[in-house]
Amino acid sequence: MRLFSLLPLLALLVVQAAGQSEVTSDDPATDAGSTTNSTTDTKPRIPSQDEILGQMPSINPIRTGNPQMDAFYMMFPALGSLLKWGSLFPAYSILGAIPDNLQPTAAASKVVLVLADDATAKTRVARQNPPPNPLGQLMNWPALPQDFQLPSMDLGPQVGSFLAQLPAMPTVPGLLGAAAPVPAPAPAPAAAPPPAPAPAADPPAAPVPDAPQPAILGQAALQNAFTFFNPANFDASSLLGQSVPTFAPPNLDFVAQMQRQFFPGMTPAQPAAAGTDAQASDISEVRVRPEDPYSQEAQMKIKSALEMEQERQQQAQVKDQEQVPLLWFRMPTTQNQDATEEKTLEDLRVEAKLRAFERQVIAELRMLQKIELMAKQMRSSAAAQNGDSPYRISYPLSRTPIHKITRADIEQALRDDYVRRLVNKEAQRRARNSGINTQKANALKRQAKSQDQTLSKEDIVQIMAYAYRMANEQMESEKGKQDKVYAAYRTEQNPMMMQQRQWSEEQAKIQQNQQQIQQNPMMMQQRQWSEEQAKIQQNQQQIQQNPMMMQQRQWSEEQAKIQQNQQQIQQNPMMMQQRQWSEEQAKIQQNQQQIQQNPMMVQQRQWSEEQAKIQQNQQQIQQNPMMMQQRQWSEEQAKIQHDQQMAQQMAQQGLMMTEQRQRQWSEDQAKIQQAQQMAQQTPMMMPQMQQRQWTEDPQMVQQMQQRQWAEDQTRMQMAQQNPMMQQQRQMAENPQMMQQRQWSEEQTKIEQAQQMAQQNQMMMQQMQQRQWSEDQAQIQQQQRQMMQQTPMMMKERQWAEENPQSVQQQGPMMMQQQMPSMMQREVEDEDNKAEDDLVGEAGPQMPENEGTARHKVDALGVGGNKRKKSKSKSAPPTVINYYYAAPQRPVVQSYGTSYGGGGYGSNAYGVPRPVNSYQSQGYRAAVGNDEVDEMLRQHQTMARTINPKQPGEVGGSESQKSNSNPPTTLTPAPQEQPQEHRVHKSPSSAPSETEIENAPSSDPQVGSIFTYGEGLLHPFMGLLPVERPDDPWNQKPYDPHHPLYTGGGSYDAYLRDGRHRRDTHIMGQGTQHGILTPGMLERLLRIKMDFQRRFPHLYKGMLNHHTNLTRVEVQPPVLGKISKPKTKTKPKNEDEPVFELGAAERSLFEDETNDSLEKDPEPEPDEEDDRDVEEPSESSEPRGFSSKKSRDENDIDYFNFDDDDVDD
């Protein structure tokens, strides 16, 4: 039973988590639904670890900033982590009630809420208190497991279905009704904690209850509501198991609110079990709240027959608004029967971890209970003394059986200041006593294992995911086909599905055009062209309504235009050009003959033709901004032409100008057009075909064209007067053809030009033309390549079809995007390779440092997941945390030569910096100036491993993969790809790059064969790296099996001559090579800035000394009050400045502004002041300069010595 109770929770959790990850839906409620029933995901998806990890808060030691909370987290690491990540796991479920949606049971209970008139039913407390609803709980729990699918997630729609399905569940109602009492005993067998009913239901039955549950709850609740309350039902253990599920039903708003509070993100999905109920069934929220207190009491009374403990649990549960017990993930024992056979080693390991975690949580809960009990006693004794009633504050924890404690209980307990104080005290005591051990463990005593192996984020995720999965698997087996019934229905609620549905509708539209495209991109064009025209009309209507189709529309318009010209193209690109060309020629000739006779008339006529065409296109074009430009342009051109045509004939000049402008425009246009075509059509491979065809080989085409042109030349000569018009007309006529035409026109122009005297101008034209055709050729090639990579293209095309809009935006980028996308594909493939753990792979250790931090390098492949600091796993792989000072062992003042303590700040020998501080691992010691500089010069203090993984993978997928190495394997897969393991090291740091690059790929037996530093490794030389988690050296910050660098065990570096202790002057004596690395420069500047900021005067003084302006400005502290206000106290003195003391250095030109100082009341200072300050009056010309300035800066300078005098 326990299993079952857990399962539902787990399922919920899973769903929840999945929802959070990607379940297919964004809102938890749907989540659950989708998880269970969506067609796509029949199984509840167990969120992948990456997903979960992605959502996890980082696992740093929890520093809330609230000392008491910190103490709590320190004392109860496991609990803390549960609470902290609760939001992730069962999400609401762990920490909050399982929303009804999620709770299959909840669904049932919803119904109950609807149906139930019993006081009890109504009173269901948010806590889904089993006590109030033992029945509900019992039912729910069993249901939960069944639900595990969370099919019932979507309660609203499903309630009906559940009821419909109830028949399948008849047993459950029986269970609920009749068995309910029975279950209490039953649960014990199943798993004492789970709800009794569940056992009765038995796993198979349990799944059914899911659907029936609502009915059951409804009927049973009504019939048996009280039964459930019977002590029998209440069997404590069953309650424990069940209470959680039970919680779901209560619709307490407050639960929802709590959730909102705690998991703001989740709220909507599962407002709270209670909220959810209401939401799902539209039951007006159950008015549980008011009855709550009394109902609880009544229940308590009923239960008083049960052990007190249960009573307490119930109360506690009532209090827990968050209905899922923290221990929801307890491993149900029953699971093992089904699961064990399949369990892989990894699963078993995780399960062991899960159990360990569970044990830890239980231990912590017990301790918390004790603390709470103490607090309670303290409070009651205090109250007794004060005559207060002792019980004003309820202490839920001590009464709540451990397995039922929910987050709410803990929160409530922590609200009590006594509890907080006790926790704090205890934490302090612990810190004092165990501090030493802890520190050692954390720092690095070899033997010390950190006392509590705190789980890393990944572990927790792994465990939780495992718990879900187990529950899930159970559920899957039992998951009714019911889910499928709703799958379709649910898809609709599921945002993801919504998207799909919407998308499919769009697809339907798009398909009219694109079915062919999809089936056969190549054929597509022909077929599409033929069909296109018809469709274009349809589309255009749709298109206007459907922005999504914009692009399509543009494309189809172009298609339409293209079609006329290009059906032929398709069959014979070359022919097409000729034909088209000849058509154009025909037109051109007509025009041109006229042109010759009457240029003006021709223009008009041509213009009208253009207009006609433009109008045809333009209706479409209007929708197509690109075309707009053209149209606009063509209109402008038309105007221009009227003027310019005359000019052309009168003076070639005019022609030249417009032509240039025109040419430039046409090139731009060509480019734009190209980009546009590509953007719009590349997805559909259109342009490629087309362009490829029409520039099969730009040179060839050009020759062809030239030949044609030559033929046409005769006809064309007339055109010469009007090349521009012609071009224009054609452009306007058909953007798609524009480029060809541009070419042809440019050619015509060229050829005419050759005949004409325009040669020089034409030369330019030619050059441009040639260049353009070259560009075209390049683009063509690229496109061709892209075509060859068609698989990619297809993908891309498909994508483009799916997101026409993005394609639009990306249009211009399309080319670039495609190239990178190919590259990216390769990279991805590489990455996939890389993901199989390389032996020597090193991964970035902390995202913040990604670029610069040193990386763990598992050079000898002694595996272990590089990404994890799990103590509990097999040997924790070397984790060298050079990044921030993690818990450190107290600094040892050793003045001997500490091995490598000279980090930046430490004196060269002295205290080794706290152990993890940045670089003081004995790993690099830079002793002389040169070395220091060198170290600075390689700016990364540790080697950088250039790691091809995408950053996203850091915590997640990698870790998943690697953590599956069963401990038994001696070494993870040999390092197959040494080349990816490129480590750039600073020389002092370690095996030279060459060593690493060429390190023989590892021998599976020995790990990678590497140059071991003999001195370092000697004792281990003979040992193969057999991983044993408990090997003491695995507890070291570095693993003898992974020497960080070879050699280096000696001190002679410190003794060698010529290598002096680093001199710490800011500017070292002679940096031998006079190098100033950016790093040094930055440091110097920073020092300078700081100094300047903190000691402005001193800085100024030093600066002046440096520059030989000796100006001393001292601003002594003013002891009295500064009496500036009395400025005029000694008016007379000013007149005769006293020249004695300051005179020599005093600037003679001081301004009166300084007088304020002189007038200080205390006579002595004044005297001096006067001396100093009064001189200014003497000569007032230059005084403004330095003295005034400096004076203004620092108000009170008793001596303001200025350059002026000094230099005198």
Curated annotation (Swiss-Prot):
GO cellular component term, pick one: nucleus
Sequence repeats, residue ranges: 493-518, 519-544, 545-570, 571-596, 597-622, 623-652, 653-680, 681-696, 697-720, 721-733, 734-758, 759-788
Bias type Polar residues, positions: 32-41, 957-977
Subcellular localization: Secreted
Bias kind Low complexity: ranges: 268-280
Top-rank taxon, per record: Eukaryota
Alphabetical UniProt keywords: Repeat, Secreted, Signal
Cleavable signal peptide: 1-19
Disordered: region residues: 23-60, 184-212, 268-294, 828-875, 944-1010, 1114-1208
Region spans: 12 X 26 AA approximate tandem repeats, Glu, Met-rich: 493-788
Entry-linked InterPro entries: DEC-1_C, DEC-1_N, DEC-1_REPEAT
Compositionally biased spans, kind Acidic residues: 828-839, 1163-1178, 1194-1208
One BP annotation, GO: egg chorion assembly
GO molecular function: cis-regulatory region sequence-specific DNA binding; DNA-binding transcription factor activity, RNA polymerase II-specific; structural constituent of egg chorion
Function of the molecule: Required for proper assembly of the eggshell.
Protein known as: Defective chorion protein, FC125 isoform
